[in-house]
Amino acid sequence: MQLANNKWRVFGTGWLIDWKKPKRTHNLSEPFYLYLATNLHIAVALSNPKDYAPFNKASIGNSLTTVFCLGKYINPQLFKLRTDVSNAFVSIQTSTIPKTAFVARDFVPLQNRGNQWVAPVRASEDDPALAKSYLDFAIIEVPLFLHNQMDKQIYDHFMRPAINTYERLGNSVGIFAYQPMASFKRDSYFALGYPQVESNIAALNLNQTEVKPTRPEDVAQVTFKEPWSVDHHREIPTLTTNQLTTIKTKHFSGSKLSWPFDHTKSFKIKNKWLGQNYQMYGHGLGIDQVNLRKGTSSSLVINQKRQIVGIYFATVITNPKKAVRNDVGLVQMLRFQGEGNSLNPN
């Protein structure tokens, strides 16, 4: 995903978590809604005055989001483009700006109750206000109007294959890992996303041309003049997974060192959003030997059994000045079997 205004661009992976078909199938004026899971620190870059309350009040530097694109590594010939590139990262601008469907926040009561096992954490040493709870997880709602050429191509080539895969898997929560907390450290993990790396892979940008607002409540995008362009040498999102730096091999390897942790005890990550201090609560997964660069945010993390474990949200750099680094990746776990009020240290 790419969100941009007149000053900056924000990249992050978004993966299809749900969708909603139009009530009237043959009425092209009704949108097909996509729901993309991502990190909250990516979703906060979305500044849409027509967003759902209270998210319509969010703004970074009073700059409104004017461009939203979805991209995928795919064969550009599917889009009938005259190019010698056989495979490229194809980015398509949607006809409207998305909205915020869900944010994981305020799920822990601030009152100190007798049976509350994690006491509220203060926002900072010099701030007496208690921080509210949050997880680095959000869902963005993207409307696709199928009479629009660009939206239709996103649906046909990006989303329809993903929906077909979900349906083949049975649309079940069985595709998510669901196991005791202590057992996660015995698995291997892979990041499925588009981290930014220096690459000579071609990037094709398909942009809206002369598109007007489809509905009054949707925000029209700033359209580019050129319908598409090819860029061979720039920092772009591309496919990758974690690789051990201590092993000299060209083959990617899943991380084999991991451990579950309590957000309030291990990293104590804090944030501020909509004028409110937030403290990360709940359980996460730490993965050793990731060494992933920027842009890994929101990547889907699976185990060796091809089950969804969680969503990648941060990298902790352990040896920034050393040639061999051992960065730790932090993953927000989505499902696990509870084991009481504390983590099993074993």
Swiss-Prot record:
Source taxon at top rank: Bacteria
A Pfam cross-reference name: Mycop_pep_DUF31
UniProt-listed InterPro entries: Mycoplasma_peptidase_DUF31, Uncharacterised_MG067
Family: Belongs to the MG067/MG068/MG395 family.
Protein name: Uncharacterized protein MPN_577
Provenance organism: Mycoplasma pneumoniae (strain ATCC 29342 / M129 / Subtype 1)
